[in-house]
Structures are given as structure tokens and as C-alpha cells.
UniProtKB/Swiss-Prot annotation:
DNA-binding region(s), residue ranges: 589-608
Pfam families: Sigma70_r1_1, Sigma70_r1_2, Sigma70_r2, Sigma70_r3, Sigma70_r4
One CC-aspect GO term: cytoplasm
Family named by the database record: Belongs to the sigma-70 factor family. RpoD/SigA subfamily.
Name assigned to this protein: RNA polymerase sigma factor RpoD
Gene encoding the protein: rpoD
Function: Sigma factors are initiation factors that promote the attachment of RNA polymerase to specific initiation sites and are then released. This sigma factor is the primary sigma factor during exponential growth.
Top-level division of the source organism's lineage: Bacteria
Renumbered residue ranges of the record's region Sigma-70 factor domain-2: 395-465
GO molecular function: DNA binding; sigma factor activity
Amino acid sequence: MSDLEKKYSKLIEGIITHLGDRKSLSFSELSNLLPDDILEPEILDCICSVLEDRGIRLVNKISELDLVVSEDGNDEEEEVEIESDRNFMILDDGFQSDEEDIDIDVKLDDCDEEDISVKDDLGSGYIKGNVLKDSHSEDPIKLYLKEIGKEFLLTGNQEVELAKQMDSGESIIENILKNEGLVIENYYNLVNTIYSRMEREEFFKREKDKDKESSPDYYNKKKRIASFYKIPLKPIQDRLISYVDNKHRVYDLGGDIFEKNLKKERLALKELLRDIPLYQEELRIFSDDYIDSANKIKDLQRQQRIILSRLKIEKIRDLRVLGRDLTIAEKKIEIEKSLKLKEDAIKEQITEAQLAQKELERIEMYYEYPTDKIISMSEEIAKGKQMMQHAKDQLIKANLRLVVSIAKKYANRGLHFFDLVQEGNIGLIKAVEKFEYKRGFKFSTYATWWIRQAITRSISDQARTIRVPVHMIEQINRLNRETRYLIQVLGKDPTDEELSDRLGWELKKVKTVKSVSREPVSLETPIGEEEDSVLSDFIEDKAIKNPANHTSFVVLQDQIRAILGTLPEREQEVVKMRFGLEDGYSLTLEEVGLHFNVTRERIRQIESKALRRLKNPKKTQKLKDYLEDLN
């Protein structure tokens, strides 16, 4: 008997006692019976061997591949076919991959419910009391793998059921928003975003305080909304704008927003808006806004109840009576004595309650429903969101092991394994949100592409100190592969010319790719034999502006502004936006066209006309002196 057999003999005897007359054991059940700190393959193999020697048949084979995350970073991906029980607690590599064709097929053996046991069913006092104690491992990866191993795998039918549940939740939300006309104001805001010219000066003033990379965000948002909603909303945009403007005008004048003409127009718009698609992003934003408004109503009503209780009145309209009584000296003294509050404190409470009431009326005007109805509909929307979220969570948790199996293929490529897993999980979440079960594909097949995309994208974005684009990464990998091949063939490092011939690239391209592939060097790298200096001591600090150049640049800006001032206002705006003269960000023809609500061709014509005017020798002569400095 080996040392391991002696050490775990009591554990093995406890397992055999638990089985009784049974002669078979699934690995899912064995995993439940074993203590959490047993993860080493040698111990598991020893236990399995002893059980097999005792005549107990094991359903599946445990291999070291299932227990230890592979550190092998090979580019070649092996095909692995896994059969696992639904409750299989050990991490399985259920990923079968090929560069051209990817197919995931996780087969689920039928599990007998009687074969699934938990630790509470064990009969051995030793196993209960000692062996099955929780082991608080300090390794987060082991803990994570252990936790995701507890999640059930899903059959194809279960995946479809969860996808249907997500659709049902989304339908509940969309039906409430559309059928009740809650999105009229939201569609009005979309129309304004699409067709109105933005406050450009205010926008650039706001963006100057931020990172310049955030400047295109507004245009990207406007472009997305325009592509989705511009054509569907165009036939009704005038009626929509007219109705909402009239409603706000009536409300501001203290009129009734539920009067006959407005109500009739609202019903007509509600019917027209039902046929307009509501995309997932807007569905999420609109429903969140509605739930936030309902929560705000609850907070305001709670605030009012507290104030009314403090002032010992029952209804909001009694606040005016209380306010008038405070102007009468005799009643004021009586009220202060009754409420045990000073006049200023009472007036402050009245003002707060009235402001809360005004905000409640504004929300009622916005959604055109009383507050009680808004709250009840928000609860239905919340149920739909909860239904969607529950189905998403189930689908995500059941496929976390798929993410790990794919992430293992990308180990040792510049990112920690756990980071790869988390990036893959982000891809999995996107796959769940975009999964269309009606197309007939298994979810694992669909999700694989999203997971791999997320992982490879994160490697290209984060693995290097300086980000290298994905297409350049592919060229670097190809260059390295051919370099290794030529070293084997030639017995020496290949020259750039030999690599150029082998790859069919121009010599310049080979040199460019090699320069990009270089790793950055630390500024703290010691320099010299005595290493008394560092690399940063020999690098010019270009952050410090040259006073002469800075002054020249400021004067140049003034000259450009003066010359642009001779152009018509619209041509000035186009030139500034096209060449980034305001914020340093040059806009495309399409982006400028979105701003002015004209075609890109019209913007090109305006730009050409403006540049022809600027080529006037009297204007260009002032700028020629700066060309030499710029060059």
C-alpha cells in the first residue's frame, strides 16, 4: 500500500460505505464527496485506482488536463471531444477548434437523480466532521475554477427555453412602452438628435475639458441613431414635434394636457409609433429612465408624507390654507405652539412639499399618466427586466467553462490567464445579448466567435505597452514564423532581403514590421559600465515648449483666424471642422454633413469653394513665411 493510499484510506472507506451495494460512481458524485482541498491529479488518480480495485466502476476518466490550466501557448489548437455529466464538477475542456470551421459539441450523459448526492447525505462521521471541511484556498484561479465547475451545463432545449424567456421579458417591456404611449417624448428627443443642429460652441467648450479622444462620441451616437431611426420617423416627425411642443406650451400656461384635441392626437401618434422598431440600446435606456422616474415618484411621495405628518395636515391642498393662516398673527402663534416649529421652519416645509408636488405634476405631464399608473407600469417593466436578467445569468453561468477552455489556447501571449478569462467573459455576455435561437445554431457554437474575438482583441490592445493593431499583429506573427523557418533552413539569422523574398513583401514593409515588433525599453535602464546613469538622462524632454516656436505658433493662429474671417460664416465653420482648427480633431465629410444636415457632397463643394477663396495671393502671402518653420 502506497503512502497516498494509507493517508486517504479513511476517506476511501467512507466513500465505499456511502455507496453501499452500488458498484458504479460518477465523477460528479465523487467530486461532491471529496474535500475541497484535493485538487492534485496524483491524489485523484490514487483514489480512482483504489476504487476500481475494489470493483467500483467510474463513469468518466479524470485527466490532468481537466484539473490544471494548460500553460502551453501553442498556436495550433487541438480537437477535444468531451463527454460529461450534467453535474460534472471538474473543469472540462469542451472546445473543439479549427481556423476555418469551429464546432462546439458538449454531450450530456443522462444523469439519474439518485446518483446526484450532496455532502449532507454522507454516512461516515469522519468524512462529515473532518475531511469535508471548507478549504480557504488563496489562489483566486483555483477558487474560480472550483465555483464555475458547480454550474450545470445546458442542453440545446434548455438554451432555447432561456432565449425564449429573454425574448418574453423584452416583449413585456416593449409592449408596455409602445402600447401605453410612454415613448412619445423619447421619440421626440430622438428626432431632435437626428435633425437639429447641435450647439456647436457649447459642445466644443464642454469637450475641451476632456480628453480629445472623447470628441467623436457625440457624432458616433448621432450617426447610430440616424441610421436606425431617421427613415422610420421621417413620415411622422412633423406631427410628433408639433404635438410635444403644444403639450409643453399648454402645461406651461397652466392648461389641461388631457384636453380633447391633444388626447386625440396622442392616440393617433401612439398607433403610428407602434410600427416603428425599438432597438435594444434604446429599449434599455427608455426602460431605465421610466423605472428611475417611478422611483423618483416614490421618493417624492415619501417626502410629502413626512412633511404632511410633521405639519399635521392630510392633503397637499391644505398647505395653502396653512400658509395663509401663518399671515394672521393670532393663528400663527397657535400654529407654532401646536407644531412646535418656528414660522420660517414651517414655511420651508411648505415650500419643499409644494416643489415636490410640482415635480410630480411634471412627471405626470411627461408620461401623460397619473403617478399611481406610472408606478404600476414600472413594476411590470421591472418584472420583464428581471425575467431577461435571470435568463441571461443562467446562460452565462452555464458557459463559463467554455470561456476557460478557449482562454487556455491563448496562454503566454502577454496577458495573465485570469485576465484572458475575464475578457472572454465579456465576449460571452455580448453573445448572450445577441443570441438568436430561431436560426437553429447551438449557443456554444455562436458564443465561441464572440469569446475568441474578445480575447484576441484584448491581447492586441493590452499585451503590449504600446498598442499594435490586430492586422499588424498578424503580420508580426507571420514574420516571426518565417524567420524561424529560414533559421532552420539556412542555419543563420535571415537578412531582410531573404525575408522579403520569402514573404513576397517589399523590403520597406519588412523593415517596418520588424520595427513595430520591437519591445519597449524602460527609461530606468542603466547606461554605461558603472551604470551610474539611466536611459532617461539622455532623452530630450519635448514636453517643454520652445518659447520662440510657441510665440510663432500663436501668431500663426491669429493670422489664420484673421484670414478665415474674410469667408462667409458657413464656409468658416466647414473649414474649421474639416481641418480641426477649433479642437484639433478633424471631422470627416459625413460628420460635418450630419452637423449641417446636408449631404457629404454638399460639404465637399463648400470646402472646395472656401479653399479657392483662400488661395488668393493677398491672403496666402501672409502665411508663406511660416511654411519654412513648419517644414
